[in-house]
UniProtKB/Swiss-Prot annotation:
One of its GO terms (biological process) is antibiotic biosynthetic process. The record marks 186 as: Raises pKa of active site Asp-170. Keywords: Antibiotic biosynthesis, Isomerase, Plasmid. Disruption phenotype: Cells lacking this gene do not produce lasalocid, they only produce iso-lasalocid. The keyword ATP-binding does not apply. This is Epoxide hydrolase LasB. InterPro entries: NTF2-like_dom_sf, SnoaL-like.
Length: 282
């Protein structure tokens, strides 16, 4: 399984080659039978020939991808990369270029090649298609509201956002838990560690179901730090003063929303390289 740093570098290299207009170079980053879904909710294209046909018009339109920081996972394959994409039709003047905020969920194989890329962006995330889309905004608001209720220590209020059929994985690659009682235990531990979350970029899928948000979180080292280390989810050295130390976690939360408007799926993408010890005096 490729290391977290390798997966992150593959995602960033994709942006570099796209920005250089290197179609063949871009294709060489993908497995021969790779799958691309862009945007999420449309039909996938499979294989390098189909990828070439899909990517060539964007490269002719001088597409430019400004990547954010990449996020890993503990499954040995995943990396998530937020980006701001600008592109125009081939030959169009600069003032007619569109701007889209996206989140790419990428799977990298043992050979270091991209096996799957699913790009999440909604009509509310692009200047090309910007129009009212209450369903997208509702999903994005649910993702942000999760962070607010955690910050308020409102576990009961948090559970009201979720379906009794919730399945969640935090972090991706650990283990999948199901049901509201499992979520209550998970959230109670977070609140007990004084978690504070700041939501960042939020995007929607065009599948009528998903949304994603980048999150910067801090928490007390105790009591959760030793537990994270025990499960090999964190590889930081023990702090000199664990009672004062803080942990920082940068992650992406992807949610799925059911027909009742409740979250029935939650995946948190973060790896060991997304965790840090913070100076409590800073």
């Amino acid at each position: 399984m490729p290391a977290e740093t390798v997966r992150k570098e593959v995602a960033l290299e994709y942006c570099r080659r796209v920005n250089a207009g290197e179609l063949e170079g871009v294709l060489q980053l993908f497995a021969p039978d790779a799958l691309l879904v862009d945007p999420l909710g449309t039909e996938p294209v499979v294989g390098r020939a189909a990828l070439a046909a899909r990517l060539a018009p964007a490269l002719r339109g001088a597409v430019h991808e400004e990547p954010g920081r990449p996020y890993a996972a503990h499954d040995g394959t995943s990396v998530v990369l937020p980006a701001t994409v600008t592109v125009g039709a081939p030959g169009a003047p600069p003032q007619r270029r569109g701007r889209t905020r996206v989140m790419g969920v990428i799977e990298v194989g043992e050979d270091g090649l991209i096996r799957e890329m699913r790009v999440m962006w909604g009509v509310t995330d692009s200047s090309w298609t910007a129009r009212p889309a209450p369903d997208e905004e509702r999903r994005k608001e649910l993702a942000r509201e999760h962070c607010l209720r955690i910050n308020d220590g409102d576990v009961d209020g948090l559970l009201k956002l979720y379906s009794p059929r919730i399945r969640f994985e935090d972090p991706v690659g650990s283990w999948t838990r199901t049901g509201l009682e499992a979520l209550r235990a998970h959230a109670t531990m977070a609140v007990g560690s004084n978690v504070r979350e700041t939501a960042g970029l939020t995007v929607a899928g065009q599948d009528g179901r998903h949304a994603a948000v980048t999150v910067s979180a801090t928490m007390d080292y105790l009591p959760s730090g030793p537990l994270l280390a025990r499960h090999h989810l964190m590889t930081l050295p023990a702090p000199a003063d664990p009672h004062r130390a803080l942990i920082g976690i940068e992650y992406v939360m992807v949610i799925g929303v059911d027909a009742d408007g409740l979250i029935d799926e939650m995946r948190a993408y973060w790896g060991a390289t997304d965790v840090s010890l913070l100076d409590p005096a800073a």
